[in-house]
Each structure stands twice: as C-alpha cells, then as structure tokens.
C-alpha cells in the first residue's frame, strides 16, 4: 500500500496502517481487488455495535465495555483477527440476542487493540466485505454465527450515468466540507484522492451525519449504483441543512448589527433632544427640589443638597455618573432626617409586652424598663448601646422585637455574621460605579424613622479581610459621643444615630474587638433552667406549635411533668430551639391521628413521648448513697445548665503518688493538689499519721471521662473526698458542695450558683455547702426554687469538714497503718 498524508475527518485519523506505525489507510483500487478476492470463513464471532455501522474498506475505532465484547475481541486478536460486525436494532439492549441485531453486517479485520485504564477496550477495525447471518450457532461466551457473503452488483464500466453520480458525490462532499465549520478543509484532499468507486460511496456514507437506521439501510443495498443514488440524496439534504443554517446565522449577525446601529442612532438622537430640551430630566430634578423644601433639614444639609442637585443639572444624562447622582439624591430625600417615632412611656404596658413574649430574662427586662423610666423623665436622653451575650437560642435576637413593640418604635435588624467588607457598614464612595450606602443608612431608610430599635446580630462573628475591618467601622456607630454625626462614604454627610437604640447580640464576648466591647453595656444572658424551659414550653412553644400544626388546646394538652421529661431526657442546650423541635414532633404525631381519624391520647402521656421521641438518652445523675469512703457530690455548671458531679477517691499501698483522672483541666488538677497538700499540712488536726502519705498511693477520679471538665469550683468537694478516704468516715447524706480552696485553708466563691442549686434540687440533694460570699447569689434566686434546701455558708475548709463528715465509719472500713 502507498503512504498517504495524515488527515482528520470527524475525529478519525486517516493514514496507511502497518505493523511499525500507527497508521490508518485509505483504500486504493489494488487494495479493493485484493480484499474482494479473499474468501470468507464459514462461521465468525459476531460483535454487535450499539450506535454505528461499519462499511467495507472504512476504518473506525470502537470502544468495548461489555464482558462478552471484550472476550470476543481478545480471543479474535489472539487468533485470526477476523470477526463479523453487525449493528443492534435497539442500542439500549445490554445483551442483544439473535433477534436484536441486523442480519446484514460487515466482515472486519482487527488492526489494533488498546486496553484503557478504566478496564474497557478500544479496537481499531477495518471493514472487508458485507455478509448475511445464516444461522446463529451459539450465544456463549459470545455470539457465533454461520455466514454467507453478500455480493455487490456493480454497474457496467461504460455506464456514464454512474460516472456522473460519482462525480456529483465528490462535488457535494467537497461542498459539505466547505459549508461545515466542524470538518477541516484538509478533508477535501482525501475525497479527491479516493480512486475506488465502492470505497468512495462507503467512505462518504460512513462519515455522513446519519442515524444508525439510515446507515444500515445504505449498507443493505446490494446494487452499487442504487447505493450511490441513495447516498447522493442524503448528501443533498445535508447540504441544504448546512446552507440554511449558515443563512440563518448570517441573518442573525446582520440583525444584531442593525440593532446596534439603531441603538447608537437612538442614543445620539436622545442626547440631541436632551441638549435641546431636556424635558424629562428637568421635571425630575424640579420634583426633587420641591420635595426638599418639605424636609426638616438644617442649613448645612439644605446647602449640601442644593449643591448636589445643581451638579446633577450640569451632568450628561447618558454618563454613568448621572445615574449614581440620581440614586444619591433619591436616597438623600428618602432618609428620615429628624423624623422620630413617638415613644410610649406607659411602663406597665412595656412590662406587660416584655413578659408576654419572653419568660425569665429579668435582667434584660429590668434594664429596658429603667431606660424607659429615665427617658420619660428626661426626653433628650441618648439611647443606650446594649450587648446581649449568651449561648444560642436564649432569645437574644427576639427580645429586640419585643423591646421595639414596648417602646412603640420601628424594628430593624442586620446580620453581621461573616461580614468582612468595611463598605458594608460605611458604604462605597460615589466615584465607584454601582456605589451604594452602607447597611446602617439603608436600614434607617427602610425603617422610616431615625430612632428605631436596631439589632446588630452576631456582632462577634465579624471578620476582617482585604476590604478593611468592619468591626473598626462600627466603633463610630456604637460610640454615643460620636454617632450623632455618623459619616457614610456614599452619603458624604454626618447622620445623627444618637437616638437609635442599638442592641448587639453575641455568643462569645472574647471574640469582639476590645475597643468595640468597651463601647457597649454588656448584659449576660445565661442558659434557661429546667424550670424556666418548662414554663416557656407551656406558655409559648406548645401553643405556638399547636397553631402551626392546625390543632387547638381541645385537640391536645400536655402537663408540666411531661414537658420536664422532654427537657431532661431529650435536650441538652442552653436555649429552647431543640426543645421546640421535640414538641413539634409530639404534636405532629397527634395531628396525624386527627387527620386519619385514629384514636389518640388528648393529653400527652409519658408513653406517648417515648413512642414518638424514643428512649431518653440524656437522663441526669441522681444522688447516690454515702456508704463508700471518698465519694462526695459536687456541683457543676455548663453552658446548658447545672448538674451534679461525683468526686471519687481510692487508696492503695504504694509510695505516696497522687493520680488524677477523668479528663480534667489544669485548674481542677491544681485543686486536687492543693487539697492534698492542705491535708498533709494539717494531718495532726485531722487525726492522720504523716506516714500514711509515704505508704499509700491516692487515686482521685471524676466520672464521665469522655467529657472535658475544668474550673476551681470542685475544690472543697475534692478536699472532703480525700479526708473521707483517709479517715474512712461517712459523708453526710443528701449533701452537695461547691467552692474554691486555697493553701491557707480559705473557701472562695464560684459562679453559676443558680444553675447549680436547681441541678442539686432535681438530683434529690437536701443540703448544700457554699462560700459565705455566694450568699448574695442565693438572695437573687426566686424562693420557690429554694424550697426544701438547707444552705451552709462557710469561710474556712475546717468548717466544710465539720459539716460534711460524720463520726461514723463507712461499711467495711479499711485500717490504714
């Protein structure tokens, strides 16, 4: 075979192929004669193709992924390299049988097999002769069939009509190549150099954009002249489609050019009209001037507006600056300069509104009522800047709306979480296209008054980036001495924010910039107690969810005991968001029963709760007996409330080592060390031999080792545990304690007293030891929460031991020598 230049048609490279080069041949008349003289085998393995048809003489690559196809190719490649190729009737069939394939196919030679990384096989095939399946011999491991050759009816060599048809085929093929943007012009060279009549028809048929059914129809035509005519018909249709497509594209391009020209002329005409008359813009600017006269501006603001309006009159209406200037003046007019909503000074009404929407939160409510009282006495008082800090879900954001309702003010809120661009606070300068005011000014425009209740939500989530530090921009907003002339970059004028009541919310005060934190009055909101959560659920959450699910109190009720079971057994949070979700689950179960007319309990029972929510997994600890030496009940406080904490200690023979376990932090470890050193220093007073500390090892442990624990409040509990262990004395029944210890024997106050007291009461504790200085914390707790509890206030460690330890030894007391 002679070598040919590399050509690419429809992603198919056309070259000569031999064993030493990766080439795919164009068929010559000599090749065709040699191929026609080859005898076909009696039977062949049959390879079904999904979406293509192989013509004699044509070379195509095939990707095989089916197991049968891969095995067939591998076996044939290892043998005679001759296979039968047929097209599937339905390309979706994964395992076609003899009834799912066309009977007419092409004998093919395997030129090359390439194994792909994904396990598939790519095989390059060259068509040889057409054949017809006589009978399928087997279908496993792949299809094998007996075949017979299908002869090709060739026209007479002197048939001038056939010659003209072939010339037309070549000419149309060249025209299609020129019209199609996807076929390279080099393909013309290949068409012109094809000498074989049948290969020309087969090559063109193979590369036309036809369906498998249409190509199979061409392959099935025995007469070469008839096949050439049918191919010519398809080519005419293809050429007409291409010409029509190109005409449409040319027309679209012309239409776009025409539209652009008309737009340009229209803009020119509009500019000329504006220069001659300028009617619409002038009217708009006159309206702005009239509206400005109704505003309560000071002289400086009035002059600034007139100056900016005059600047707008001189601008070209088509320039981008004109649109920015219009937006600026519209904002200037829409801002509520000097417009304030009238405050309601009915303090009883305000208290009622606050109590209606929020249970507890006494400190916040007290501060709001105090502000109202002072505002009532002195009308020009600057609004406070308050920061409510506490865990999620305790009502920090929602209380702002209640405050606005109580004061009779508008309510606006912006979320600062993730804000990293200073321009979001101060706005963009007017020199930028698309410039806008900051969120503060935009929110005031939306509120329509200059004294709304303004919630700055998640102020601790502010972050800085390449566009500046928004937390620094807030320094001016939240400074009562500066915010009477807040400067927005877009507004370019000082705006009075002194009457705005800013309420910021945060979860972590440590994340707030110190200078910003210093400008705010911080009110800490601790998590709700169990009792408060139950009351909130009863007053607010349960009725709210009943209404949300289309039920009323006649359809379903719930008792405090069941609400407490949900709170303690299924939630562990500071707020009430998860509690509301659990209540909604219980109500949905009842709503389903109502809708399906099923029987159900109209009063929620414990069994209903377990049925809907499952078995409780968050049961709290209860007080245990005092029969074991070294076991003392302490009190702990976390962000989700209080809990009791057991301190355990054990003694064993050794050399005086102290082991501390239970996932404790450094502060708790130090408390244990202080307690032991205090006992050593006061061994004689406690009736202990100093030799004990050289002969025995002590192990101190706090259960629930998976939970990290830290803080000084377990100090007196650790001390009591170690003394009980060393003396083998019983600890007083139903007693818990909390307090920090020092080497001098002093007991210091600790925090979270309210939560700890409530946790102790729930756990069945009757007596509690506290530092004397914590008495003020007890005085702030409602009396109903303290019923049944006895408090012992101490200053010294000796007082703790005198109260906590009894004269009785524990059962099976050890004798320590």
UniProtKB/Swiss-Prot annotation:
Keyword vocabulary terms for this entry: ATP-binding, Cytoplasm, Hydrolase, Nucleotide-binding, Protease, Serine protease, Stress response
UniProt keyword annotation of Nucleotide-binding present: yes
Enzyme active site: 713, 756
Residue intervals of the Lon N-terminal domain: 44-239
Major location (coarse): cytoplasm
Function: ATP-dependent serine protease that mediates the selective degradation of mutant and abnormal proteins as well as certain short-lived regulatory proteins. Required for cellular homeostasis and for survival from DNA damage and developmental changes induced by stress. Degrades polypeptides processively to yield small peptide fragments that are 5 to 10 amino acids long. Binds to DNA in a double-stranded, site-specific manner.
Subunit description: Homohexamer. Organized in a ring with a central cavity.
Name of the protein this chain belongs to: Lon protease
Gene coding for it: lon
């Amino acid at each position: 075979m002679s070598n040919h230049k590399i050509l690419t048609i429809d992603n198919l490279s056309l070259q000569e192929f031999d064993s030493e080069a990766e080439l795919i041949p164009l068929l010559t008349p000599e090749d065709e004669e040699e191929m026609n003289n080859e005898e076909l085998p009696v039977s062949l393995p049959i390879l079904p193709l999904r979406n293509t048809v192989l013509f004699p003489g044509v070379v195509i690559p095939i990707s095989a992924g089916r197991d049968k196809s891969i095995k067939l190719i591998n076996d044939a490649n290892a043998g005679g390299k001759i296979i039968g190729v047929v097209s599937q009737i339905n390309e979706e069939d994964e395992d076609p049988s003899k009834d799912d394939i066309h009977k007419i196919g092409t004998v093919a030679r395997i030129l090359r097999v390439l194994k792909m990384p994904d396990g598939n096989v790519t095989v390059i095939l060259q068509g040889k002769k057409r054949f017809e399946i006589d009978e399928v011999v087997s279908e496993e491991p792949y299809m094998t069939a007996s075949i017979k050759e299908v002869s090709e009816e060739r026209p007479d060599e002197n048939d001038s009509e056939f010659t003209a048809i072939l010339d037309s085929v070549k000419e149309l093929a060249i025209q299609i190549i020129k019209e199609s943007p996807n076929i390279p012009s080099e393909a013309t060279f290949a068409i012109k150099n094809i000498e074989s009549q049948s290969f020309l028809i087969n090559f063109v048929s193979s590369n036309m954009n036809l369906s498998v059914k249409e190509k199979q129809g061409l392959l099935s035509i025995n007469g070469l002249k008839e096949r050439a005519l049918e191919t010519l018909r398809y080519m005419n249709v293809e050429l007409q489609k291409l010409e029509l497509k190109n005409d449409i594209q040319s027309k679209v391009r012309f239409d776009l050019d025409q539209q652009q020209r008309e737009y340009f002329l229209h803009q020119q005409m509009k500019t000329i009209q504006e220069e001659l008359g300028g009617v619409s813009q002038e009217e708009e600017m006159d309206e702005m001037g009239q509206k400005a006269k109704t505003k309560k501006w000071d002289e400086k603001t009035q002059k600034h507006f007139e100056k900016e309006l005059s600047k707008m009159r001189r601008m070209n209406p088509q320039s981008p600056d004109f649109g920015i200037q219009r937006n600026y003046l519209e904002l200037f007019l829409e801002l509520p300069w000097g417009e304030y909503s009238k405050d309601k000074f009915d303090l009883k009404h305000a208290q009622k509104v606050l109590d209606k929407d929020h249970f507890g939160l006494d400190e916040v409510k007290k501060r709001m009522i105090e502000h109202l009282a002072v505002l009532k006495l002195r009308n020009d008082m600057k609004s406070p800047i308050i920061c409510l800090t506490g865990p999620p879900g305790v009502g920090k954001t929602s209380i702002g709306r209640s405050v606005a309702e109580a004061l009779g003010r508008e309510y606006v809120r912006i979320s600062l979480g993730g804000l990293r661009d200073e321009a979001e606070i101060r706005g963009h300068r007017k020199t930028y296209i698309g410039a806008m005011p900051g969120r503060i000014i935009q929110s005031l425009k939306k509120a329509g008054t200059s004294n709304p209740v303004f919630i700055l939500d998640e102020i601790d989530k502010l972050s800085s980036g390449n566009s500046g530090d928004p937390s620094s921009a807030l320094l001016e907003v939240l400074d009562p001495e500066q915010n009477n002339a807040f400067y927005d970059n877009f507004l370019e004028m000082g705006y009075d924010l002194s009457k705005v009541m800013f309420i910021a919310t945060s979860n972590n005060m440590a994340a707030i910039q110190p200078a910003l934190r210093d400008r705010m009055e911080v009110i800490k909101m601790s998590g709700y107690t169990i009792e408060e959560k139950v009351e909130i659920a009863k007053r607010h959450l349960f009725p709210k969810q009943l209404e949300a699910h289309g039920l009323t109190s006649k359809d379903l009720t719930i008792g405090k005991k069941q609400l407490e079971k949900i709170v303690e057994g299924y939630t562990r949070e500071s707020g009430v968001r998860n509690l509301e979700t659990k209540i909604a689950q219980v109500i949905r179960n009842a709503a389903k029963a109502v809708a399906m007319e099923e029987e159900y309990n109209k009063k929620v029972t414990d069994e209903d709760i377990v049925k809907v929510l499952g078995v409780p997994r968050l049961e709290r600890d209860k007080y245990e007996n005092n029969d074991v030496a070294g076991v003392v009940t302490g009190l702990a406080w976390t962000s989700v409330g209080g809990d009791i904490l057991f301190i355990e200690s054990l003694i064993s023979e050794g050399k005086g080592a102290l082991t501390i376990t239970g996932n404790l932090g450094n502060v708790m470890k130090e408390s244990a060390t202080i307690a032991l050193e205090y006992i050593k220093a006061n061994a004689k007073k406690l009736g202990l031999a100093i030799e004990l500390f050289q002969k025995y090892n002590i192990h101190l442990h706090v259960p629930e080792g998976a939970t990290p624990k830290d803080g000084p409040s377990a100090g007196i509990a650790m001390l009591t545990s170690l003394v009980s262990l060393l003396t083998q004395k019983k600890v007083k029944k139903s007693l818990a304690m909390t307090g920090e210890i020092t080497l001098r024997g002093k007991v210091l106050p600790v925090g979270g007293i309210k939560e700890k007291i409530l946790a102790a009461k729930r756990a069945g504790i009757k007596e509690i030891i506290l530092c004397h200085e914590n008495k003020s914390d007890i005085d702030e707790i409602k009396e109903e929460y303290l019923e049944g509890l006895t408090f012992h206030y101490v200053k010294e460690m000796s007082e703790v031991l005198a109260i906590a330890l009894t004269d009785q030894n524990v059962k099976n007391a050890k004798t320590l020598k």
